[in-house]
Amino acid sequence: MTTQNKYAFSVSVITQYLADQSDADEDRYAFAYHITITNTGAVAAQLISRHWIITDDNGTVNEVRGLGVVGAQPLLQPNEQFEYTSGTLLNTPSGSMRGTYQIVAVDGTQFEAMIAPFTLAVPRVLH
């Protein structure tokens, strides 16, 4: 097994526009994102912190760093998953998010799990 496969997490994302928490007249667009993190490696590892890069359609970038996710620093065994839901606000009807999770394996090895860019967008309404 390669080192790359020994230390690996996968991340999947589902997004949702929150119309009831948004106000287009105030340029306030609320979105939820549901994350599933899976330890696809061969050793147990703990998610320590996160780094998000949130970009709206105007190109405004907001970086968010913090410990854990939703108050937790989950320790995941191989093939174990952790799910959570969080949210963000944009000043435009659409934008994107991407980032990384900083992770430490039980043997002390530090690595990052990449969070591929995903889109946040107000659904189009057809009349």
What kind of region is each of these model predictions?
Residues 43-62:
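Short acidic, flexible loop segments centered on an aromatic residue
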Residues 23, 44, 91-95:
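Short glycine/serine/proline-enriched coil/turn segments at secondary-structure junctions
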Residues 28-34, 98:
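Short, solvent-exposed loop/turn segments enriched in Ser/Thr/Gly
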Residues 37-41:
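Asparagine-centered strand-capping/turn motif at beta-strand->loop junctions
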Residues 1-28:
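Low-complexity, acidic Ser/Thr/Pro/Gly-rich terminal tails and inter-domain linkers that flank the onset
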